[in-house]
């Protein structure tokens, strides 16, 4: 087992940072009245890392203004016991089998994703159902990693980003 960090904010956010990287096997948890975890840029979960964010109030439990990248075996848990989203994420990237459990508040969704162009799978659940603002991609939740297909069908017009496509 790796290191763990638990932060609670009594009148703000549990964690407020930029470029968060949670190393392999490590665990980070944030809880606060203005949100559990807030990143003004990217969040990276390395293999086997876990991130949890909680709030009882009227802000997102997790807010990521950049890309949230999850490596194989990593886990994300978000819970908003107030009104808003469990997580608001600009862009999502998943590699391998990951675990996501997301619960949104009374007037929102478990996961709100601004840009999602590829289809992805995760073990877990999202209540209410994940919402994508821009793009045709979606996240499908399954109850066991064995149900994740080896080749995930992509939406019409999807172009996988590679080093070659990024240079164009």
Outline where the language-model segments fall.
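A composition-driven surface/loop motif
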Residues: 1-168
């Amino acid at each position: 087992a790796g290191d763990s960090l638990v932060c609670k904010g009594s009148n703000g956010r549990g964690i407020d940072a930029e470029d968060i990287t949670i190393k392999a096997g490590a665990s980070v948890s944030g809880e606060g009245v203005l949100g559990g975890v807030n990143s003004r840029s990217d969040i990276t979960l390395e293999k086997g890392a876990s991130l949890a964010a909680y709030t009882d109030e009227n802000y997102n439990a997790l807010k990521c203004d950049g890309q949230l990248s999850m490596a194989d075996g990593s886990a994300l848990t978000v819970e908003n016991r107030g009104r808003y989203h469990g997580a608001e994420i600009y862009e999502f990237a998943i590699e391998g089998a990951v675990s996501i459990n997301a619960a949104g508040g009374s007037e929102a969704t478990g996961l709100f994703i601004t840009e999602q162009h590829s289809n992805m799978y995760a073990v877990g659940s999202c209540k209410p159902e994940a919402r994508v603002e821009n793009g045709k991609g979606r996240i499908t939740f399954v109850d066991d990693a064995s149900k994740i297909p080896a080749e995930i069908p992509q939406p019409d017009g999807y172009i996988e980003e590679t080093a070659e496509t990024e240079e164009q």
